[in-house]
Amino acid sequence: MNKVILYCRQGFEKECAAEITDKAAQQGVFGFARVKENSAYVIFECYQPDDADKLARELPFSSLIFARQMFVAGELLQDLPPEDRVTPVVGMLQGVVEKGGELRVEVADTNESKELMKFCRKFTVPLRTALRDAKILANFETPKRPVVHVFFIAPGCCYTGYSYTNNNSPFYMGIPRLKFPADAPSRSTLKLEEAFHVFIPADEWDERLANGMYAVDLGACPGGWTYQLVKRNMWVASVDNGPMAQSLMDTGQVTWLREDGFKYRPTRTNITWMVCDMVEKPAKVAALMAQWLVNGWCRETIFNLKLPMKKRYEEVSQNIASIQAQLDEHGINAQIQARQLYHDREEVTVHVRRWWAAVGGRRDER
């Protein structure tokens, strides 16, 4: 198996391909990306047969911006016989995976694939039974063993392969299933909720998204992102010239500051979170975020960078590099992650966590 398949947002295949080619080369792995426009997936074919597995093990999935999922795959299985589609799939996986922990029969995230999804649901049950009989799947689901992927690109055509649970997306098709809260002021609230799921390990939520923390939301109107912070019982300063939803103001946890998010300067010194979803040039937003981090005005931040029409991967990489350069210049150790989330559109969500403060005499929690 010499291919790595990556799922992405429809229309962002070129960015995903540019990124995997770049990141693979940094790992000493060379190959070429096959891109079909608006297919919502990319195939990276490695020149060396073992290199696909090397990428699946050693290229941190968390370092990829445009990929929703990454798994190793073999050749395309075509023209599966309608009377027995199971046997060829089992045959392809024989000797490749042993006692996998989970089976995911998936499709690309496109409108055209919705009909295929119905078939995948029906196909999963008999396939799971056959894979367990062949010892390709364990008799019970476990997160400690590889995930078996069967990826249908058309009726009767699929790729088969595997991913490692310590280096993949835990979500089916790489998409967290979130429900829009009826009392949220806008659908943008799902972006921040998804960001929490993607960037913060579940066992750290109680510590890092804790009751009573102080947070700032820049460009908050009408309050979609503020809603997520209020829901976690934080005190929020919502900065925007536009009005906030009355339902949020009624909680007593929100202070509305009628100011420009770019000009606002915090007076508190104990702000844990700053979040920002402003429609502005990405370089300008990145510069503002760097200023907050360098000055120690917050410990963690999640913000969106709106993407240009062209050279989107290059633009995002440049923005993140400029933040990293300013942090390095001031001796600040930080973790930076970025991802184009399912609920993002022409944008990328970035998370930065400062490990220690830039302000003298002040310590972070770690």
From Swiss-Prot:
It catalyses: cytidine(2498) in 23S rRNA + S-adenosyl-L-methionine = 2'-O-methylcytidine(2498) in 23S rRNA + S-adenosyl-L-homocysteine + H(+). S-adenosyl-L-methionine binds at S188, C221, P222, G223, G224, D240, D260, D277. Its EC number is 2.1.1.186. The active site is at K306 (proton acceptor). It is found in: Cytoplasm. Its main location: cytoplasm. It comes from the Bacteria. One of its GO terms (biological process) is rRNA processing. It is an enzyme of class 2 (transferase). One of its GO terms (cellular component) is cytoplasm. InterPro entries: RlmM_FDX, RlmM_THUMP-like, RNA_MeTrfase_FtsJ_dom, rRNA_MeTrfase_M, SAM-dependent_MTases_sf. GO terms for molecular function: S-adenosylmethionine-dependent methyltransferase activity. Gene3D superfamilies: 3.30.2300.20, 3.30.70.2810, Vaccinia Virus protein VP39 (3.40.50.150). Keywords: Cytoplasm, Methyltransferase, rRNA processing, S-adenosyl-L-methionine, Transferase. Monomer. Belongs to the class I-like SAM-binding methyltransferase superfamily. RNA methyltransferase RlmE family. RlmM subfamily. Catalyzes the 2'-O-methylation at nucleotide C2498 in 23S rRNA. This is Ribosomal RNA large subunit methyltransferase M. It comes from Cronobacter sakazakii (strain ATCC BAA-894).
